Amino acid sequence: MLAANERPEAPTAIRIDLGAIFVSLELSRSKWLITSLSPGGGEKMSKHAVAADDIAGLLARFAELKRKARARTGRYFPTIVIQEAGLDGFWIHRVLQAEGIESHVVDPAPIPTSRRRRRAKTDKIDGETLVRALLAYKRGEPRVCAMLRVPTPEEEDRRRISRERKALTNERVRHVNRIKGLLFSQGVSGYQPLRRDRRTRLEELRTGDGRPLPTHLKAQVGRELDRLELLIGQIKAVEVERDAMLAAAPVGSAHFADCEQPAPAMLLALKGIGPEFAAVLWSEGLSRHFDNRRQVAAYAGLAPTPWQSGSVDHDQGVSKAGNPRLRTTLIQGAWLWLRHQPHSALSLWFKQRGKQNDGRLKKKKTIVALACKLLVALWKYVNAGVVIEGAVMKTP
């Protein structure tokens, strides 16, 4: 045992010299929890709550934090705010920026948390965790969190068209399946609700035992057709709006010099790429700025996820941590690319991988790899004008 005079000294507190007031916002439908760490206040974080959507109360609390920090230190400090991306969108971030406050929106998934099976989870703990993540980010520590690049209101609104069309088509599928299910219970099959003569054919239908359709069932199917026709009209209206958006895209949307065409027009010029594919690619992905192809693949969730520990070294597949709409569209577009661009370098690579597997083509994994390669190739095509090797353009 060590003597009293030989015992190590007790650890001293780490001195923190803050150059700003660091604030995190925990947003909910009823209240906003403000967690702050101010200069001159030690290591203890203060917490205050304001009613949800009370911007005036939020700004008043920020002003009070500045006043107290100035009273303690005699200096003026800026405010730096962090919040998680969620249901509230980006309007609070834009309000804070308009007030001259530095604001950050963070992806909550990569923030380090306890790996215990049952861990404590409260707004207080989450607020303190966000403040610590913000401190580490401002110190320049790598991979401590993932800050989002907040889209402009125009970029955010541009995505609405393709997303609304997807929601409408999903709803259309539900109505079609419901109509077919109602009729199948009466022994009727082969009825196509999407055909133009759907009303006429409904009047001619007979049950499996030769009876006319029951009165109430026929009325229910008629009301389902009313909803289906409303959806069909709305989908057509959205598609017209989508085509107008693609046609009105500025020439500068292609990011390289001497480009006389906007990015959507360049995409539509390739055989196998239609208006919907081009709209999703442009609005969800290619309209953004990326520094390299790794960022492109990571944004779509198509980046590899390695697992290395000791002698274990294998790949877990793609991360799926990116934009799910873009990733789904790319998988579908990869199959269309094989059909319409069979002699391109990408399609030949896909076929060569099949031969290497002795004909037992692992299509699911290979088509995902092709989708990643296709996205990178289209990004280079739109941003640098690099034409995809062997790609065929549409005939005018």
From Swiss-Prot:
Tell me one GO biological process term. Answer: DNA transposition
Q: Which residues form the signal peptide?
A: none
Which keywords annotate this record?
Answer: DNA recombination, DNA-binding, Plasmid, Transposable element, Transposition
Read off the InterPro entries from this record.
Transp_IS110-like_N (IPR002525), Transpos_IS110 (IPR047650), Transposase_20 (IPR003346)
Q: Which Gene Ontology terms cover its molecular function?
A: DNA binding; transposase activity
Q: Which PANTHER family match?
A: PUTATIVE TRANSPOSASE FOR IS117-RELATED, TRANSPOSASE FOR INSERTION SEQUENCE ELEMENT IS1111A
> What family name appears in the similarity comment?
Belongs to the transposase 20 family.
Q: What is this protein called?
A: Putative transposase y4rJ
Q: Which organism is it from?
A: Sinorhizobium fredii (strain NBRC 101917 / NGR234)
Lineage summary: Bacteria, Pseudomonadati, Pseudomonadota, Alphaproteobacteria, Hyphomicrobiales
